[in-house]
Amino acid sequence: MDGGAEGSQQPHLILANKLFLLTHPDVPDIEKVQLKSEVLDFIRSHGMAPLYETLIASSVLDLDQSLLESMRAANEEELKKLDEKIADAEENLGESEVREAHLAKALYFIRISDKEKALEQLKLTEGKTVAVGQKMDVVFYTLQLAFFYMDFDLVSKSIDKAKKLFEEGGDWERKNRLKVYEGLYCMSTRNFKKAASLFLDSISTFTTYEIFPYETFIFYTVLTSIITLDRVSLKQKVVDAPEILTVLGKIPFLSEFLNSLYECQYKAFFSAFAGMAVQIKYDRYLYPHFRFYMREVRTVVYSQFLESYKSVTVEAMAKAFGVSVDFIDQELSRFIAAGKLHCKIDKVAGVLETNRPDAKNALYQATIKQGDFLLNRIQKLSRVIDL
């Protein structure tokens, strides 16, 4: 994508977030009025006729025929100039200048949000590119375009292409940037464990400011780590990480969310959790997984609480979390039924009894299950052979 000073988020991805909020069911109408004005101003200043037409068709924006026609005319004029530069480069200059002229046209299509023509022109530019590093840059432009449209099929294919390019060479700076792109892809497709691993690997080398600021990166790193790391790893890699500590306090509720969980301050955790929920709900990458993530966090915190007890009263647990007995009873019933918690409720006594399997028992049960599966496969195979 074009624009965006070094070290700042691409303007198009800021626009993408505004478009997400503009169509979000929970954003108040008064805020949407301001968002609509900001979106229209951005489209007008960047001459984004193709995007404007798409948003009109989906009833996000209203049609202003004169604006649309003026943007179309400006697009045609600029594309004519770019084609003239390509022709001049092909006639009078070298391969490097030809490539740059084609890339300029690709970036213009990205700027005006003409996705299909941008991809076509990026492919053409890639064909005129020799250096692995420059080929990687074309992939990064494609990834930014794909994240703008939330086209995860294109993201996946582009990441695979980048990894193949790295087999031919490539520098560490670009390899580290790719980890963040892949981490964002994994988080956006609900692979939180891999996302956390990739984000944690990138903390000390983060330079991917074009897709989000460093604070947002830390926000995602903490969120994905909390539901995927054990306590020891969480302490080593997140709670005590200097890079995280430097910005943790700048992100509302995040410090309380992380530290109260680790320090078993459950009432404070639930208070911070409510604040975090709002931020997750208004994040374009996390919103589709909002309910899933909220369940996973509660599974982690309830499991951690119960880990310390063989039995505990429901009332004591409710008090620890600062909620009513009825609430915690309903919560636990759902989580136990879903197989998320290893305990049972004695309704008469109002007591929770844990029955979590130890590591040896878990391994034993898994071995039996795998053995039964193997035996069934052998029996099916023997019947086929007998026939």
Curated annotation (Swiss-Prot):
SMART domains: PINT. Ubiquitous with highest expression in flowers. It comes from the Eukaryota. One of its GO terms (biological process) is protein catabolic process. The keyword Transmembrane does not apply. Residues 191-359 form the PCI domain. The modification N-acetylmethionine is found at residue 1. Residues 65-101 form a coiled coil. Keywords: Acetylation, Coiled coil, Proteasome. One of its GO terms (cellular component) is nucleus. Belongs to the proteasome subunit S10 family. Component of the 19S regulatory particle (RP/PA700) lid subcomplex of the 26S proteasome. The 26S proteasome is composed of a core protease (CP), known as the 20S proteasome, capped at one or both ends by the 19S regulatory particle (RP/PA700). The RP/PA700 complex is composed of at least 17 different subunits in two subcomplexes, the base and the lid, which form the portions proximal and distal to the 20S proteolytic core, respectively. Acts as a regulatory subunit of the 26S proteasome which is involved in the ATP-dependent degradation of ubiquitinated proteins. This is 26S proteasome non-ATPase regulatory subunit 6 homolog. It comes from Arabidopsis thaliana (Mouse-ear cress). The gene is RPN7.
